[in-house]
Amino acid sequence: MSNKLVLVLNCGSSSLKFAVIDAQTGDDQISGLAECFGLEDSRIKWKINGEKQEAALGAFTAHREAVEFIVNKILAGQPELAAQIQAVGHRIVHGGEKFTRSVIIDDSVIKGIEDCASLAPLHNPAHLIGIRAAMASFPKLPQVAVFDTAFHQSMPDRAYVYALPYKLYREHGIRRYGMHGTSHLFVSREAAKMLNKPLAETNVICAHLGNGASVTAVKGGKSVDTSMGLTPLEGLVMGTRCGDIDPSIIYHLVHQLGYTLEEVNNLMNKQSGLLGISELTNDCRGIEEGYADGHKGATLALEIFCYRLAKYIASYTVPLGRLDAVVFTGGIGENSDLIREKVLNLLEIFNFHVDSERNKAARFGKKGIITQDNSTVAMVIPTNEEWVIAEDSIKLINKE
């Protein structure tokens, strides 16, 4: 029987991640990254059956040319595999309130994604370019949109409405939306399996920690609160994003220090977070190296990162009422035993006790419980957003 394969596309502003995923197993048959769009050294790297390959895309390549390369060069060299692709699944960062679940893409869906572009100006326009490129290259395959925000549409209004004049929400949609929903969905499901509990009876707090980072309270398989807001800027300290700050800082920077609003936006999104505090790097590995060497900026950045994360985790016990586990995922969450241990030590009041050997073992793609047997459970689960996108794509096309 042929496999149920899906080509998954994740279009950034100047890059395109892609994978051919088996929707039944989550295994990637092909995976790769095209990057540096718009520059002379645009390149594409991919892996088939563990074999890594790389090629130049040519000067000033963009999404359409990258998709054409995937079709005409990579997939053309794997005709049996290409023939099993049943759909193209697209990761879409922001679906606003228009999209509460994954959908098959048609003209109305494209219009809806366009309408949400103001909420994700760096991401949604790039997703639309990727969708149109995929439609041109795969005119006979169904295209599916999977939204990062959809999982969080189950939040109650007390969690997503800001304490601003209500008409700003009613008339302009200004509210908390949250991100990383596909990742939080996947790891919360996997956590229930590891706990040997029905998903509907499982309460977990998921920490997706990468250059972007967010925490979500998941009650019975549904998001009930999350740290990112209208945009990905709110919440935790991140690689280059400031997370939560006093909003009046913006007024102070503009009116007292002479910043423009564009400069403030750039400062808070690209110059803050771990990079801004440490004055060293946004890469957590570099921060940990600096911490080990006694670098004051790196040490402070690490301490603030862990402290803010622990406070969020503690606060999310409120909407859950009962906590079954804390789940770490994402590049930092999956690989930094140091950060996991620091965060859980700050949460000792909740009876977290780290098992050092288990914690060190749960790295580099290995999942596992990292706490002692008599402790509240904390675990590491590598995320697999592409698998969720592939699963949703197959489910949707089978309903048609």
From Swiss-Prot:
Query: What terms describe the molecular function in GO for this protein?
Result: acetate kinase activity; ATP binding; magnesium ion binding
User: Where does it primarily localize?
Assistant: cytoplasm
Q: Where is this site: Transition state stabilizer?
A: 180, 241
Keywords of the record = ATP-binding, Cytoplasm, Kinase, Magnesium, Metal-binding, Nucleotide-binding, Transferase
Class of the enzyme per the UniProt entry, highest EC level: transferase
The subunit field of the Swiss-Prot or TrEMBL record says: Homodimer.
**One of the GO BP terms on file:** acetyl-CoA biosynthetic process
CDD domains reported for this sequence? ASKHA_NBD_AcK_PK
Localization recorded for this chain is:
Cytoplasm
Concerning HAMAP family, the annotation shows:
Acetate_kinase (MF_00020)
What cellular-component terms does GO give this entry?
cytosol
Known role: Catalyzes the formation of acetyl phosphate from acetate and ATP. Can also catalyze the reverse reaction.
**Cofactor requirements of the protein:** Mg(2+); Mn(2+)
SUPFAM superfamilies on file: Actin-like ATPase domain
Q: How is the cofactor bound?
A: Mg(2+). Can also accept Mn(2+).
Q: Where does Mg(2+) bind?
A: 10, 385
Q: Which family would the database say this protein is a member of?
A: Belongs to the acetokinase family.
Protein name from the UniProt record? Acetate kinase
Active-site residues, Swiss-Prot/TrEMBL: 148 (proton donor/acceptor)
Instruction: Indicate which residues the UniProt annotation says bind substrate.
Output: 91
Reaction equations catalysed: acetate + ATP = acetyl phosphate + ADP
Q: Which organism is it from?
A: Shewanella sp. (strain W3-18-1)
Return the InterPro entries for the record: Ac/propionate_kinase (IPR004372), Aliphatic_acid_kin_short-chain (IPR000890), Aliphatic_acid_kinase_CS (IPR023865), ATPase_NBD (IPR043129)
